[in-house]
Amino acid sequence: MKILIALSLLLCTSLVAAELPKPTDEPILTIAGLIQNSNSEGAADFDLKMLQAMPQHTIVTRHPWVESRHHYKGPKVSDLLEMAGARSTKLTLVALNNYEVEIEFDDIAEFEPILAWSDNDRVMRVRDKGPLWLMLPIDKHPELLQMPYNDFMIWQLRSIIVK
């Protein structure tokens, strides 16, 4: 029995501090800062294939930047933070143009935001606000249209810094 417990603890410890697989394509997302799991010099890099291999979730919603209801698909932000072994919920989200948003993830965790890579079943390109867009379910929670929530919906997301 003691051996079984010791093996279980060893397995759990190795999962918490596990090495992430390296991306095989160009990374589109980097999670850095206070993280435990990395695959690139203290950071966790993800290519599109890695994000698509994670459990996918869909948010169907309208928002100020589109005229009609859109179907967005991608992994939950909470799953990505867990995979990287984030040790804090204070985040800085950085877009391709270096636009930054400071966010306390606990403030929006209940809404289960996703990092959308697909808009209406099409992979989002940079010209379409891709490759990643933090998406909130505004139709289900109209209060998300108010400040500061709509500021958190950063598009062309390239990195998350855990502070």
Show where each model-derived region lies.
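Hydrophobic h-region of N-terminal signal peptides that target proteins for export
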Residues: 8-17
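Positively charged n-region of N-terminal signal peptides that target proteins for export
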Residues: 1-4
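N-terminal intrinsically disordered, low-complexity segments enriched in P/E/S/T
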Residues: 18-163
